[in-house]
Amino acid sequence: MKFAIFGNTYQAKKSSHAATLFKLLEKHGAEICVCREFHRFLKSDLKLNVKADDLFDENNFDADMVISIGGDGTFLKAARRVGNKGIPILGINTGRLGFLADVSPEEMEETIEEVYQNHYTVEERSVLQLLCDDKHLQNSPYALNEIAILKRDSSSMISIRTAINGAHLTTYQADGLIIATPTGSTAYSLSVGGPIIVPHSKTIAITPVAPHSLNVRPIVICDDWEITLDVESRSHNFLVAIDGSSETCKETTRLTIRRADYSIKVVKRFYHIFFDTLRTKMMWGADSRV
């Protein structure tokens, strides 16, 4: 099998996990391609002698499977690079939460064995696409988790006029607005009171950030509907954050958000169940009185 490896470049203390991964793949005779930036970090900064049959930049690669070793942020970066290639992504968690990257370092060896035995499942995760005339946002307009519209450099709220399929929904007076996929519903959206949505739902969550109203609540819509946003701000600009990567926009920029025409394939072990992950990672339903 041919693997493309992505990893973060700051977790020096957890370098042994990366070394273990490469040894496991080499043991199976895998063809290993490594993101050049990650390879440089391993070789130059950590002095690890890892096998790499090829190095690649940006999205200039092909593979049977992508492995992301790091946290959920590393997984999101890998997903951005994979784009519409249709390559499944396996996430190994060396970060904190690990909701997307949910294979622990202790499970690595067993998981790689399962990959070679074709004993795993692949989940299709929907992606959001942002359409606008801002050239900076056009470089990477896709989000696996969320697209967030936020105020910038001001204590004043922004006004976000929101339409669904051309029909006016409301004008949010708030610090921002989060448009999230089911995958992203357990990320930024959850932290501001958004709903938890099971990954396979064909829906999009719209959640305001600190709205100046008691009558505004999150809303869930069909994922084949189109969202149009017009923003007004006293500073005449605002932030757009796509899976955490942000750019400044002028308030004259109209934003259109819809489901992308491709999905991200996420590799899951058979016994990794979404509701189990909710309980163990998010402490869902935990009661200290019991």
From Swiss-Prot:
Family as reported in the entry's similarity comment: Belongs to the NAD kinase family.
User: Can you tell which superkingdom this protein's organism belongs to?
Assistant: Bacteria
The species is Bacteroides fragilis (strain YCH46)
Q: What is its EC number?
A: 2.7.1.23
Q: Which residues bind NAD(+)?
A: 72-73, 77, 145-146, 175, 186-191, 210
Question: Where this protein primarily resides, as one coarse class?
Answer: cytoplasm
Protein's name in the database: NAD kinase
InterPro entries assigned to the protein according to its UniProt record, in alphabetical order: ATP-NAD_kinase_N, ATP-NAD_kinase_PpnK-typ_C, NAD/diacylglycerol_kinase_sf, NADK
Its encoding gene is what? nadK
Question: What are this entry's molecular-function GO terms?
Answer: ATP binding; metal ion binding; NAD binding; NAD+ kinase activity
Q: Where can this protein be found? A: Cytoplasm
